[in-house]
Curated annotation (Swiss-Prot):
Changing E55A: Strongly reduces MMS2 binding and interferes with error-free DNA repair. GO terms for cellular component: cytoplasm; cytosol; fungal-type vacuole membrane; nucleus; ubiquitin conjugating enzyme complex. There is a cross-link at K92 (Glycyl lysine isopeptide (Lys-Gly) (interchain with G-Cter in ubiquitin)). GO terms for molecular function: ATP binding; ubiquitin conjugating enzyme activity. This is Ubiquitin-conjugating enzyme E2 13. InterPro entries: UBQ-conjugat_E2_core, UBQ-conjugating_AS, UBQ-conjugating_enzyme/RWD. Disulfide bonds: none annotated. It catalyses: S-ubiquitinyl-[E1 ubiquitin-activating enzyme]-L-cysteine + [E2 ubiquitin-conjugating enzyme]-L-cysteine = [E1 ubiquitin-activating enzyme]-L-cysteine + S-ubiquitinyl-[E2 ubiquitin-conjugating enzyme]-L-cysteine. Keywords: ATP-binding, Isopeptide bond, Nucleotide-binding, Transferase, Ubl conjugation, Ubl conjugation pathway. Changing A110R: Lowers rate of ubiquitin chain elongation. No effect on thioester formation at the active site. Pfam families: UQ_con (PF00179). Has a role in the DNA error-free postreplication repair (PRR) pathway. The UBC13/MMS2 heterodimer catalyzes the synthesis of non-canonical poly-ubiquitin chains that are linked through 'Lys-63'.
Amino acid sequence: MASLPKRIIKETEKLVSDPVPGITAEPHDDNLRYFQVTIEGPEQSPYEDGIFELELYLPDDYPMEAPKVRFLTKIYHPNIDRLGRICLDVLKTNWSPALQIRTVLLSIQALLASPNPNDPLANDVAEDWIKNEQGAKAKAREWTKLYAKKKPE
């Protein structure tokens, strides 16, 4: 960890020692800027029965540049496209060096709880969500069962 900036070391230590409920973020053994992340689907959301895998990468310019995050688990969500890219303001225009990895992960977890079809990345999913929200939520639940890891009982 010696070649990493102190900020990354501190954030990593805090993520491991004081994890966010429902979220794990483990640095990769070979590259400590790369994290394997899991996020549990929030209660009372179409994703509540699943655990989703993501990858998070801290660019060389971090914290001046936002982390790069994407879903590895296929998910039916208006703000996440087929490639796993996420439409989230804190990853784009609202990024600030004052924000941390845990803030980003909490924001992604909140996005699962409250999809926003009015600011979509997956236009087809957003259209479904707007036309028939209950049907879209049912499809999101179905995809969660098909593609996400099941939460332990």
